Amino acid sequence: MANLEKLVEDLSALTVLEAAELSKMLEEKWGVSAAAPVAVAAAPAAGGGEAAPAGEEQTEFTVVLTAGGDKKINVIKEVRGVRPDLGLKEAKDLVEGAPQNVKENVSKQEAEEIKKKLEEAGASVQIK
């Protein structure tokens, strides 16, 4: 424990330039980057106009579960079919926490297929 406290004291004594150099050295040594990840989706424009400029068609869509409906068990099963990375608890939380994004950055065809499956299971769904 004393070693950690000493390390904290040593790091606290570094100047900004020394801390920046330490950061670069650790990035090189560990093969990582301290850069903040780039946001995937931008917020809609304040004007409320079209999301894409005229002449350009939107190519990536987000499937949003707006309500789980009365048949939540069926909806949870379909969510897990669409998102196999989710466990039962995560899928249940997604359905009960609607509105939630089910899947992001998908093609129009895939978004329509997901919407159809979820609506057949009893959910209310939007594509954005």
Swiss-Prot record:
It comes from the Bacteria. Keywords: Ribonucleoprotein, Ribosomal protein. One of its GO terms (molecular function) is structural constituent of ribosome. InterPro entries: Ribosomal_bL12 (IPR000206), Ribosomal_bL12_C (IPR013823), Ribosomal_bL12_C/ClpS-like (IPR014719), Ribosomal_bL12_oligo (IPR008932), Ribosomal_bL12_oligo_N_sf (IPR036235). Pfam families: Ribosomal_L12 (PF00542), Ribosomal_L12_N (PF16320). One of its GO terms (cellular component) is cytosolic large ribosomal subunit. GO terms for biological process: translation. Coiled coil: none annotated. Gene3D superfamilies: 3.30.1390.10, Single helix bin. Homodimer. Part of the ribosomal stalk of the 50S ribosomal subunit. Forms a multimeric L10(L12)X complex, where L10 forms an elongated spine to which 2 to 4 L12 dimers bind in a sequential fashion. Binds GTP-bound translation factors. Belongs to the bacterial ribosomal protein bL12 family. Forms part of the ribosomal stalk which helps the ribosome interact with GTP-bound translation factors. Is thus essential for accurate translation. HAMAP family: Ribosomal_bL12. This is Large ribosomal subunit protein bL12.
